């Protein structure tokens, strides 16, 4: 069957906009909820934190699938790519249904176990029961979206995301301001919009991709083993990152009594995320190209493509982060009028220039290594330096030396840059060439 072979730019632009819309939907939800109450925002944020922990489990399959599917597509075996999708779909669906039932039934017990603030309990319980009870959608959407992307169909996934977000916005407005459903309304709107998103990506995949008709097949156990071989380390890295960031925030909460430092980090993060989404899109697009080239044994093209993606990423990250730093004094005023807070956010955005350069390099080379089959090395780097540099740096520079949020950002930037150097050196060693999944 015909694969939609595309360039780095053609693949990355739709992925970038899809990531951007995903980020904006979260911001819109927060802004609309804030009109109800600060407690509602806090409750939903808390519930989403715990839902995210469970969603990591679904990443084991979806991230491993991309490597297996792209390499087999590059090797001219789309039938095996279809087989990988089917196995991933079944595996994720079974786990997701069990997880959905667990969250729906035991939402209150989970929140009591983590000692949530009493003022947030009822709203968080409502949200966790509804959205958590439908978390199977979070397991299935990435499977179908990845399936479209690896065959070169990135616009369809983008349109599904846009339509889902528009529906979410409209339903939020109706449920919040017309029907006065509060948190229950936001949760219901979230679930309905995700159902629409799932229907679109599943339908587009069935209509556009005919890999099912290709005759290539191998033992299902072998495919599942390959998926887990790549996906499990990737999911571990995500889990380690989330735990590390939890510790960083915990240290930052100890820096003052009014929460200024951790709040400044939140504002700086919201601004810097626009730079991050471009780097993430380039990394995902290059991962697809890398898989295609490795499947076809085109190793020189892998090197050229990954270097090109990293250069594009560094240039865009530099331009955006420098712009944000220079205009930080004005951008921060969107969130707050507190002069001290604005000055602190501006300082963090200046350090963020270095952080973003490390992060985009880390993303591009790290994703390329995972797609090539060399998935363990990024986890080892993360396990060591996320905790030594990011967590340890936050404690040492932020608390011990008294640099507070500025010190925390020095630690975070150090982590990204050290890991970036490690990823580049690992890629240049060429060891990933022997980790391919296709015979």
Language model segments and positions:
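Short alpha-helical transmembrane segments in multi-pass integral membrane proteins
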Residues: 1-15, 69-136, 178-232, 290-355, ...
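Transmembrane helical elements of multi-pass membrane transporters/channels
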Residues: 10-29, 130, 164, 193-197, ...
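Residue-level hotspots within pore-lining transmembrane alpha-helices
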Residues: 17, 21, 25, 54-58, ...
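Helix-terminus/linker motif at the lipid-water interface of multi-pass membrane proteins
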Residues: 24-42, 111-118, 174-181, 239-270, ...
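Small-residue (Gly/Pro/Ala) motifs that create kinks and tight helix-helix packing interfaces
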Residues: 29, 145, 171-172, 176, ...
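Small-residue hotspots at the loop-to-helix junctions and early N-terminal turns
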Residues: 38-49, 124, 128, 187, ...
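Small-residue-rich hydrophobic transmembrane alpha-helices
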Residues: 41-101, 138-157, 249, 262-328, ...
């Amino acid at each position: 069957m015909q694969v939609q072979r595309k360039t780095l730019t053609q693949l990355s632009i739709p992925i970038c906009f899809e990531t951007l819309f995903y980020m904006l939907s979260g911001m819109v939800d927060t802004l609309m909820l804030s009109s109800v109450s600060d407690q509602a925002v806090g409750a939903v944020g808390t519930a989403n934190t715990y839902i995210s922990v469970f969603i990591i489990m679904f990443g084991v399959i979806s991230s491993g699938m991309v490597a297996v599917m792209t390499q087999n597509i590059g090797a001219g075996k789309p039938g095996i790519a279809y087989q990988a999708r089917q196995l991933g779909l079944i595996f994720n669906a079974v786990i997701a249904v069990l997880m959905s039932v667990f969250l729906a039934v035991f939402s209150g017990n989970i929140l009591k176990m983590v000692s949530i603030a009493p003022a947030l309990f009822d709203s968080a319980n409502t949200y966790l029961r509804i959205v958590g009870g439908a978390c199977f959608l979070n397991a299935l959407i990435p499977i179908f979206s990845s399936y479209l992307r690896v065959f070169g169909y990135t616009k369809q996934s983008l349109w599904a995301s846009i339509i889902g977000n528009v529906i979410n916005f409209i339903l939020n407005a109706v449920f919040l301001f017309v029907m006065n459903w509060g948190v229950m309304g936001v949760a219901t709107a979230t679930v309905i919009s995700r159902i629409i998103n799932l229907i679109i990506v599943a339908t587009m995949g069935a209509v556009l991709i005919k890999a099912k008709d290709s005759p290539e097949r191998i033992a299902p156990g072998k495919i599942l083993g390959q998926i887990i071989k790549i996906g499990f380390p990737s999911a571990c890295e995500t889990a380690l990152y989330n735990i590390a960031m939890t510790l960083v925030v915990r240290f930052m909460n100890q820096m003052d009594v009014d929460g200024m430092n951790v709040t400044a980090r939140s504002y700086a993060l919201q601004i810097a995320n626009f730079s991050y989404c471009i780097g993430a899109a380039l990394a995902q697009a290059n991962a697809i190209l890398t898989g295609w080239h490795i499947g076809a044994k085109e190793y020189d093209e892998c090197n050229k493509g990954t270097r090109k993606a990293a250069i594009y990423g560094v240039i865009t990250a530099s331009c955006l982060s420098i712009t944000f730093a220079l205009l930080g004094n004005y951008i921060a005023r969107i969130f707050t009028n507190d002069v001290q807070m604005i000055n602190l956010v501006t300082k963090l955005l200046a350090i963020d220039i270095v952080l973003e350069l490390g992060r985009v390099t880390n993303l591009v080379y790290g994703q390329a290594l995972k797609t090539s089959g060399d998935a363990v090395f990024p986890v080892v780097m993360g396990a060591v330096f996320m905790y030594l540099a990011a967590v340890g740096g936050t404690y040492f520079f932020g608390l011990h030396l008294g640099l507070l949020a500025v010190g925390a950002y020095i630690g975070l930037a150090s982590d990204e840059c050290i890991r970036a150097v490690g990823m580049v050196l690992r890629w240049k060693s060429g060891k990933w060439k022997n980790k391919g999944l296709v015979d």
